């Protein structure tokens, strides 16, 4: 599943293509969204933003389109009138005079209003977004020590969007390597220095990934040029200590780590 940095980079491309422009053609695959097709034509796309792994598209008459890519959803930017050849199922087409944005394969799509947006179950449940630059390591540390999070193992906690939105499996792996922590630990077991190191890594790694990822290549892990230290490096040497990177399954996801320096 694409993680927060990939969703934010996709949103950046959508913003460049259609924000501030008037819609000339709108198409939705799902019957419940069909009534909005004619309503949205002539409206402007005011803003596109991410909340964790969800994407929100704001229109000039206060409608908000909610979409979540889940495992297989992907956005594409094309020229107006263009329909790329693909085996994916088209879900959304929002077209302006010169560009169009297309959503394929996703199924979690809803039309909301500014009034109903805050009541959406997913948006109510998620924690602060790791790519929100106003979020500080001190605030993350406070969150780690909240009663509902402090005794949860990091292997599961770092996948829980209620803790911090936008994290996922490769970020979980890389963050714990950076913090030199084994996945079975909990925040309640850490000393002050370890808490500070983990809190910084929880923000630095996702932001570094967002700032250093390239054009999507579907044959790679979401087009990553971000330098993985342990993810997908089973059997290789750890660059920090020379130990052997291992792979196991944690919370039903593959987990990569160096048992020698992650303790």
Curated annotation (Swiss-Prot):
Where along this sequence does the record place binding of DNA? 70, 125, 169
* UniProt entry keywords in alphabetical sequence: DNA damage, DNA repair, DNA-binding, Glycosidase, Hydrolase, Lyase, Metal-binding, Multifunctional enzyme, Zinc, Zinc-finger
BP GO terms, sorted = base-excision repair
Give the InterPro entries listed for this entry. DNA_glyclase/AP_lyase_DNA-bd (IPR015886), DNA_glyclase_Znf_dom_DNA_BS (IPR015887), Endonuclease-VIII (IPR023713), FPG_cat (IPR012319), MutM-like_N-ter (IPR035937), Ribosomal_uS13-like_H2TH (IPR010979), Znf_DNA_glyclase/AP_lyase (IPR000214), Znf_FPG/IleRS (IPR010663)
Q: Where are the zinc fingers (FPG-type)?
A: 229-263
Span of the signal peptide: none
EC number(s): the record gives 3.2.2.-, 4.2.99.18
* Gene Ontology molecular function: any one: damaged DNA binding
- Reaction catalyzed: 2'-deoxyribonucleotide-(2'-deoxyribose 5'-phosphate)-2'-deoxyribonucleotide-DNA = a 3'-end 2'-deoxyribonucleotide-(2,3-dehydro-2,3-deoxyribose 5'-phosphate)-DNA + a 5'-end 5'-phospho-2'-deoxyribonucleoside-DNA + H(+)
The cofactors named for this UniProt entry are:
Zn(2+)
Free-text comment on the cofactor: Binds 1 zinc ion per subunit.
At the top level, the lineage of the source is Bacteria
- Where does the record place the catalytic residues? 2-3, 53, 253
Q: Pfam families this protein is in?
A: Fapy_DNA_glyco, H2TH, zf-FPG_IleRS
NCBIfam families registered for this protein in UniProt: PRK10445.1
Its annotated function is as follows: Involved in base excision repair of DNA damaged by oxidation or by mutagenic agents. Acts as a DNA glycosylase that recognizes and removes damaged bases. Has a preference for oxidized pyrimidines, such as thymine glycol, 5,6-dihydrouracil and 5,6-dihydrothymine. Has AP (apurinic/apyrimidinic) lyase activity and introduces nicks in the DNA strand. Cleaves the DNA backbone by beta-delta elimination to generate a single-strand break at the site of the removed base with both 3'- and 5'-phosphates.
Give the family, as the similarity comment puts it: Belongs to the FPG family.
Q: Which PANTHER family does this UniProt record tie to the protein?
A: ENDONUCLEASE 8
Quote the protein name from its UniProt record: Endonuclease 8
